Amino acid sequence: MSDLRETRLEKAASLRKVGKDPYALNFHPTHKTAELQSDHKDLPNGQDREIKVAVAGRVLSRRVMGKLAFFTLLDESGSIQLFLEKATLEEFDTSENQVSSFKQITDFVDAGDWLGVNGILRRTDRGELSIKVHSWKILCKSLQPLPDKWHGLADIEKRYRQRYLDLVVNPDSRKTFRRRALTVSAIRRWLDERSFLEIETPVLQSAAGGADARPFITHHNTFDIPLFLRIATELHLKRLVVGGFERVYELGRIFRNEGISTRHNPEFTSVEIYQAFADYNQMMDLTEELISSVCIEICGSTKISYQDVSLDLTPPWRRVTMQELVLEATGIDFDNFDGDQEKASSEMINLGLEVPSTADSVGRLMNEAFEQKVEPNLIQPTFVIDYPIDISPLARKHRCKEDMVERFELFIAGRETANAFSELIDPIDQRERLLAQQIRKNEGDIEAHSLDEDFLNALEVGMPPTGGLGIGIDRLVMLLTDSPSIRDVIAFPLLRPDSGSQ
């Protein structure tokens, strides 16, 4: 690698000697390569089209054949062949260099370099649309060679660590992140068109609330106080509803100091949406309409394939209670235990289910049974509704079912994609539940909710009936791009430090 780098440094010096700065100030492209490929499909083989074009991009490959050379140039939209002819370049070369323009580009320009070219269009005898280059400009001399074009980046870990190389050599990665950007834009546009306002809330917070999660902790030097990176946007968005914003959302980064897996990254993106005068039934309607609309815009249909499994995101989606699903999968009816935790635990153990020490109530035990026996099998979009109150301290009590709340989670392809409530607006009930969470925290539950007095004060000012929804953007993008790991859809995921790095 050091020898190759030294050779490229020598070529950069050679470019300077012939008056070409290897690190240019600018260039003015007139077209994207995809635009040229699309607009000139009718150009016959072996013919030129006298349309002047200027294109810039990275050289992916090069072949020199005597007085001819063929480069492949990649820009953001796609690629195109460059047709370089010694006689043509000399005809348009107005410089007085002793080294010809053709020799300069074939001797001093490598795969990986950024290049700007001017010329006309030509379709080769073999049918390849090309730019017949009249003049060229080196834009950036690359000192590092590109990965082998046939094998690319075989090391998946290296793809994540050096995403810039992955994007150069892997068109699927470029497609994934383009789709991610379009998905985010589509979600915002859908919400904006329905009178939702996006309002930013603090990333640094004095109390980490809104989710069962362990926060990252930092310190503010001027105030000499600890602060937390937000684990959710929920509590501040609810304050905005209290203040009179009836439809509000925020799409942004969330931080949780937790494990890493194919489904989890400590830094991720979510959108939280709050609608006054709505309940969880209306939020289910909103969820399936939003996601199906985005799916059509990004994929062209609500019927997609994910990891060789056909998914149909056409509304309406199945709505079923957690209790019904657990009964169906295990034969255990948690409605029959009447709070008897020991009996519920015993039945789970008899079925071979794990019973962690944190599952210290019938509701928590039912949730454990759900996660172990039901969740992985929820492939088609399914709203799982009516959750135990024990695990839902911010959701409103169910209008009919004791010890339950009006909450749903959306599952697609065996994983949670969204979470929503009829929001708890009773300040007395909310205080009691957060105090219970505080007791759990004091007993060592590091993921229990914090007591946020300012949030409770806001509820006492008065919050209208509200439906709230959170959607994991990364997991949604995984579905829309057929990506098996969350690290495939996050441009720069958090990785363990490379022991070989300097």
UniProtKB/Swiss-Prot annotation:
EC main group: ligase
Keywords, sorted A to Z: Aminoacyl-tRNA synthetase, ATP-binding, Cytoplasm, Ligase, Magnesium, Metal-binding, Nucleotide-binding, Protein biosynthesis
Residues the entry annotates as binding Mg(2+) 1: E409, E416
Name of this chain's protein: Lysine--tRNA ligase
Compartment(s) of residence: Cytoplasm
Keyword Transmembrane among UniProt keywords: no
Family: Belongs to the class-II aminoacyl-tRNA synthetase family.
GO biological process terms held by the UniProt record: lysyl-tRNA aminoacylation
Cofactor comment: Binds 3 Mg(2+) ions per subunit.
Residues engaged in binding Mg(2+) 2: E416
Entries under Pfam families matching the protein: tRNA-synt_2 (PF00152), tRNA_anti-codon (PF01336)
Recorded GO MF terms: ATP binding; lysine-tRNA ligase activity; magnesium ion binding; tRNA binding
Gene (name only): lysS
Assembly and interaction partners: Homodimer.
An example Gene Ontology CC term for this record: cytosol
Organism: Prochlorococcus marinus (strain SARG / CCMP1375 / SS120)
Domain of life: Bacteria
PROSITE patterns, alphabetized: AA_TRNA_LIGASE_II (PS50862)
